[in-house]
């Protein structure tokens, strides 16, 4: 999982 990247993109 990529929490850091997930927070930056957050496009789900």
Curated annotation (Swiss-Prot):
What name appears for this protein in its UniProt entry?
Small ribosomal subunit protein uS19
Family listed = Belongs to the universal ribosomal protein uS19 family.
Is this entry keyworded Ribonucleoprotein? yes
Q: What does this protein do?
A: Protein S19 forms a complex with S13 that binds strongly to the 16S ribosomal RNA.
Keyword Ribosomal protein in the entry? The reply is yes
A GO term from the CC aspect: ribonucleoprotein complex
Q: Which GO terms describe its molecular function?
A: rRNA binding
Superkingdom as given in the UniProt entry = Bacteria
Keywords linked to the UniProt accession: Ribonucleoprotein, Ribosomal protein, RNA-binding, rRNA-binding
């Amino acid at each position: 999982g990529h929490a850091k990247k997930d927070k930056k993109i957050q496009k789900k």
